[in-house]
Amino acid sequence: RSPDVSWVRKTRWDELRLEDQEKFAPICPDFVIELRSKSDSLSQLKSKMEKWMENGCELAWLIDPIQQKTYIYQPNVAVYEVTDFDQKLSGGTLLPGFELDLARLK
C-alpha cells in the first residue's frame, strides 16, 4: 500500500532504473503522511506507519482529524503525539522550511 503523501530524496530517486521510476517505484519514501479518514482503523494505520519506519522512512506523520491528534514517527525515537490542531508541523532537517499548519484541517 502507498501512503497518502510521500517524498523521496532526489539522489535516491535517481538511483532507480527509469522503468522503475515510471511505475510504482520499489523504494521506501524518506517522508510519508497518512491522513485518517472515517473508514480507516487507527490501529491499522499505526501498524502501517511502523512498517514504513522499519523499512527506512526517516519521518512520518499520521494525522487524525477525527480525534485532532497527530502521531510523529522518527527512527529510534518514541512516537511523539501532538494533541491539538493549533500547531504547525515542521519537516525539520529532512525538509527544511516545510511546514503543515494543522489548523487548516479543522
Regions found by a protein language model. Give the residues of each.
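C-terminal interaction segment
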Residues: 1-55, 59-106
